[in-house]
Amino acid sequence: MDFKAADNLQDLQYFGEYGGVNPSISDSSTYTFLSAKTMFDTFEGNTEGCYLYSRHSSPSNLYLGEALAALEGTETANVTASGMGAISAVILQLCNAGDHIVSSRTIYGGTYALMKNFLKKFNIGISFVDTTNLDAVAMAITPKTKMLYCESVSNPLLEVADIEALSKLAKKNNIPLVVDNTFSPLSISPAKLGADIVIHSLTKFINGTSDCVAGVVCGTKDFCLGLKDVNNGAGMLLGSTLDSLRASSILKNMRTLHIRMKKHSENAMYLAKNFEKDGLRVVYPGLKSHVGHKVMKKQYNMEYGFGGLMTLDVGSLEKANALMELMQKKHLGYLAVSLGFYKTLFSAPGTSTSSEIPLEEQLEMGLSNGLIRFSIGLDDHIDRTYMAMKDCLIKLDILKPLSIKV
């Protein structure tokens, strides 16, 4: 793909109020006006460059939104206080009572719970389907469908969505394709493949330091302005406002995203290849054995690799828990949810990030008890990490040591 997101970010240049190399932080909740008429015009949306109240917008949030739009290649972007804040705002902006959504069945547990449990209160229907099966997606679409939703790389099974094909199907039915690209910033550019709206949890790779919670909606100017409408905008009225200080820190961390994503992907590929050679059940989109490998190769940005997430299936929850506890004890990472941190994070999604999904549905979609999701860190010597992880696997009898010939 010719789209150069990292160059777009590098070309952004802001000056602080006193000439600083970082833009000044707008540390105010409300803003003054020299005339009452200007305040009125700002309420009406008829003034450029004026700020009224930080739930509406703030300079720090607009700077970050501009950078995220450059990252995804969209016209603009609205930042939110969490990824779920972004997802819920988009859904309630697009859907009214009686409408319908077609969603991937393998999605983040919080999104699943929102769609299956909470949206009932608004009489919004949901069909969960295997979005890698285009026929199943087409059959699920009804005249009431107002949105097709998927994750570029799914949480936690790492299924790869054929975004271009899904986009064609969505356009054929005059519905927007909404893609959560949290797992694959830079690696995949959904808007360039036909997605209408791109969502991220900024908490993960984009921020990269696991010290804040934030989200974003990337899309057209019309859609994002609609989200901020003071009378009808779901983003405005639900009030998921990102703090200016956090917006500023995320913007600074974005400057190293291209370097970090390359290293996350490089390390994940090394571990996935070697553990697969060892005979373990590994899922990683960069492996030829991955069912979505060809789709991933067709749409990924090669220089950023196949992403920093991989899974290992060690056979049982007991073994998974024992392995994670031992790896943490050996300083190989943290037994923690989330992803995109500079140190490796691991969790058993069936009992954590996907626990909102009923057990029978977990099994139906292939989410086994022994599955461990790894967010691979920025280890400088990944071969050293591999050997230490392998020692843990051998110690717990998950992996057999090679026979030693005398």
Language model features: what each stretch is:
Residues F40-T47, E325-M327, M389-D391:
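Short Gly/aromatic-enriched secondary-structure transition segments
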Residues M1-S58, E66, I372-S375:
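N-terminal "arm"/small-domain region of PLP-dependent enzymes with the aminotransferase-like
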Residues K116, G125-S127, P143, L317-E318, ...:
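PLP-dependent enzyme catalytic core of the Aspartate aminotransferase-like
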Residues I250-I259, G307-G315, R373-G377:
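Short, well-ordered beta-strand elements within core beta-sheets of diverse protein domains
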Residues Y14, D27-L34, F183, L271, ...:
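Glycine-rich beta-alpha junction loops
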Residues M269-K343, I357-L363, S403-V406:
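Conserved small-domain helix->loop->beta segment predominantly found in fold-type I
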Residues A5-Y14, T76-V283, K297, I404-K405:
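Conserved PLP-enzyme active-site core in the AAT-like
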Residues S35-G85, G110-N117:
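Conserved N-terminal alpha-helix of the aminotransferase class I/II PLP-enzyme fold
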